[in-house]
């Protein structure tokens, strides 16, 4: 029996599921450490602002915001947490979760794939290297395929499904950055090519032009570091938004969304991210990173200076510092002590 043939659901043959998630430190400690992270890394000038779209190039390079939202709804922040930027690829795990909710996690894996490609986020070769055209929902090819599976009889209905779902994750109505959207529509030749290749492999659920447009729109929504923290905390809280208390997706769906974030959330540097930080994360060229600590909360960061892989440098530094200092790293255990 292959592991992919195993049941993909939240039933464990009648056995009660237990989770080991712990909790965040007291609120005073959390806010102190968030402020310390901002102070430590705010002067770092490494990296470059994305030049993919003119609107991104104009973002002030010194902006930096950190927000931690616990599953209890408490918000701790420092810096430019309300500055709005385009969500870009950080939208991917949330749309994937919405699609899993709609069609089932097993079907989503069969249609999209979940393994890391080890290649750049916009690689066409990754599709062709896979014998069946499946990649990963966290890279562009897999994300476009994911978006194509959104339910709806028309593209308007599909967009409403995506938009409403992302707004529910954020707990507020999001706005579309028309300038970025129009610029992307005029220049997204590579994504159009990716969609056509996917169509050739039979991996799209709708017309490639529609799939590319829907994907472009979802990436052009404005969010803040605070929004990302709330969205991450919703995944951390089993699909329930900790501010609105609305259930966005089922508890088991969060497992699958976090799993693909671990495999490819920071593209070809996902291994380095996991090695250093030990948590599911997702980055975007707009400068945002969302980090999720299951059962504890979501961390949203914004800083537009990026490394060569398109990941926010300050965001990575802040996540590394806070994952350990707040006790969120999934791979760190309590130090062993001899017991009498």
Swiss-Prot record:
Subunit structure: Homotetramer.
Entry binding sites for substrate: 89, 140, 191, 215, 267
Name of the gene: glsA2
Name the UniProt record assigns to this protein: Glutaminase 2
GO biological process, one term: glutamine catabolic process
Superkingdom, taxonomy of origin: Bacteria
Catalyzed reactions: L-glutamine + H2O = L-glutamate + NH4(+)
Enzyme Commission number, as recorded: 3.5.1.2
Source organism per UniProt: Yersinia pestis
